[in-house]
């Protein structure tokens, strides 16, 4: 028996679904069928109970459906899907990795918020994705040390600047020292580094040597440096 709920646009969305019937519809050659099903699944996942979504059979069914549908889904539908499932711990790993490599407008919410993305996924993305994707990774909250080290090795100025502005990243002292060193040639890094909570007084003293007057004043005020 199907139990309907109302979708975000007033459409009926089922919360008990026959996997065989849905997979048949997902394999339909009619674009309208595939589009309708993906929209219903997006609405469903946005409203279903977490325990229901975490059930093994449901996780397998959702993963198969999304991977079948997303390959031919239009851009705006993929974007809606990414926004809906970005923070979801139940999201299929394969789907999240596919969306993370999509156009940046689609990938950004997934890169920023998905708890499904692991360090090795993010490091792989740094190698395989565009500069915009790499910047989004550097801005991700609570970025781990292995990912930070991968960013530092690439030495991409725009990505380093994004990392310098990430106050929640787990930046070690040695990584912070490397960022300060990079700021000598990358001027855009200087202002966020001067405000960074992990900047120490000895690092500030080095940073002071190549920043402008306004940042020098800020550093002196913050660390009581001897100009």
Please give the residue ranges for each predicted region:
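Alpha-helical scaffold segments
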Residues: 2-227
